[in-house]
Amino acid sequence: MQNYQLVLASTSPFRQQILAKLKLPFVTAKPDCDETPLIGETPEHLLMRLAENKARSCFLADPSLVIGSDQVCVIDDQIIGKPLTTEKAVEQLLRQSGQAITFYTGLALFNNQTQQTQVLCDTFTVHFRTLSESMARRYVEAEQPLHCAGSFKSEGLGIALFERLEGDDPNSLIGLPLIKLIQLLENEGLNVI
C-alpha cells in the first residue's frame, strides 16, 4: 500500500469534523469548480458531477486520495439551496413543515496516481414535524443555519424539527457519508481499522 496524502476538497467545518472521526491524517483544500446545474440535470447526476469535479480540482501532492462531496435537499422535485438569510431559512422550514424531504449527497474519491475516480450518490430522507412560524423563527435565531442546505443542523437543535429520519448513515445528512467513504478508501487499499 502506497502512502497517500488524504485530502478533503472542502472548507466546510462540518465535513472536517465528520472526516476526523476516522482518525486518519488529512489536509483540506478549497475546491475550484463551477457549481451551476446543467439544464435538465437530476440531483443525483449534479452531485456526482460536482463531487468529482471538486475532488479532481484539489490534489496537493503525489500521491493523493482526494475526497469530494456536495449536497442538496429536494422537496417536491425542486432543489433547495442554502438559505443565506434569516427570512429565507424560516421560509424553507415552513415549506418543509409536515413534509418528507430527501437529501442527496454526492461523494467522490479521486486517486491522482491512477487518475481514477470512484463516484456515488447517497440519499437520506428527513420527515419534518408540523412547525409553526414561531417555532421556525426560534430555531433559526437559536442556531443560525444560514449556510446549511434545508435550513437546519441535524447534529444540534435541528433534531427537534423532525418526526423521523430514514437513511443508512446519519453522517450523510451532515454532508459526508462515512460508511460509503470507508468502502471507497478500502477499495484504494487504505484500511480505516
Curated annotation (Swiss-Prot):
Transmembrane as UniProt keyword: no
InterPro entries: ITPase-like_fam, Maf-like
Listed name of the protein: 7-methyl-GTP pyrophosphatase
Main enzyme class: hydrolase
Biological processes, Gene Ontology terms: nucleotide metabolic process
Record site feature (Important for substrate specificity), residues: 14, 71, 155
Active site: 70
Example GO molecular function: nucleoside triphosphate diphosphatase activity
Record organism: Vibrio cholerae serotype O1 (strain ATCC 39315 / El Tor Inaba N16961)
Alphabetic keyword roster: Cytoplasm, Hydrolase, Nucleotide metabolism
Entry GO CC: cytoplasm
Disulfide bonding pattern of the chain: none
Cellular compartment(s): Cytoplasm
EC number from the UniProt entry: 3.6.1.-
KW Cytoplasm (keyword) present: yes
Names of required cofactors: a divalent metal cation
Family: Belongs to the Maf family. YceF subfamily.
SUPFAM superfamilies xrefs: ITPase-like
